[in-house]
Design a protein with these regions (language model features):
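Gly/Pro/Ser/Thr-rich low-complexity, intrinsically disordered segments predominantly at protein N-termini
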Residues: 1-199
Length: 199
């Protein structure tokens, strides 16, 4: 097992691929180490991140509030926050800052599948919010992984540069400079995220 310390919000990355943790083992590992946030990438490496600061928490709360409010009005999909984790087709277990899944896709899973700790479902839409210590290149790679695994729309919001990187299913990436609002396009028809509280 190799350890690679990194100077950002990722405290370290552990190559645990030889261990092949089951969902139950990974859940138990997360439960016993609640001061940290864990994900497993597509190569099987365990990514350990530190908690964000208050400003990041405030921004994340605002993003989740707006997404949930819209989702409840529209009733075609469900909004989730970062405590929810799912398993992508490449085996990565991810928990973006916010994500949204069409209701018919979510309820196509059995009750048992929905109650699994790391359900095997690809969100239709994800948001990652950059914190001050996040490495931008690593977040961009993560967004690429989402799209490669079937996410239809993704936003990487960078409040420090006041930029939004928009990732689409055709693998195109658009960067908006200091937008005040961003549209959910045809994936989240009618949804606009007001960024004035984020900047």
């Amino acid at each position: 097992m190799s350890v690679a310390p990194i100077q950002d919000s990722v405290l370290l990355t552990l190559d645990i691929s030889p261990l092949k943790m089951t969902d139950q083992q990974f859940y138990e590992f997360c439960r016993r180490n609640q001061d940290f946030r864990f994900e497993i990438d597509g190569t099987g490496s365990l990514i350990v991140t530190s908690p964000g600061g208050l400003e990041t928490s405030k921004r994340n709360s605002e993003i989740n509030f707006q997404l949930r409010l819209w989702a409840e009005k529209g009733k075609i999909g469900l909004a989730f926050e970062c405590r929810g984790m799912f398993t992508l087709p490449n085996g990565a277990r991810r928990s973006p800052d916010a994500f949204w899944i069409l209701k018919d896709r979510y309820y196509a899973l059995s009750k048992e599948e929905r109650e699994e700790r790391f359900a095997r479902i690809v969100p239709d839409f994800v948001i990652e919010l950059r914190s001050k210590s996040d490495n931008l290149r690593k977040l961009q790679n993560k967004m690429g992984e989402y799209i490669e695994n079937g996410v239809r729309l993704g936003w990487l919001i960078d409040p420090y540069e006041r930029r939004v990187h928009i990732y689409r299913a055709d693998e195109s990436v658009e960067v908006l400079e200091n937008p005040q609002k961003i549209s959910g396009e045809d994936i989240l028809s009618g949804f606009e995220l007001d960024l004035t509280e984020i900047w």
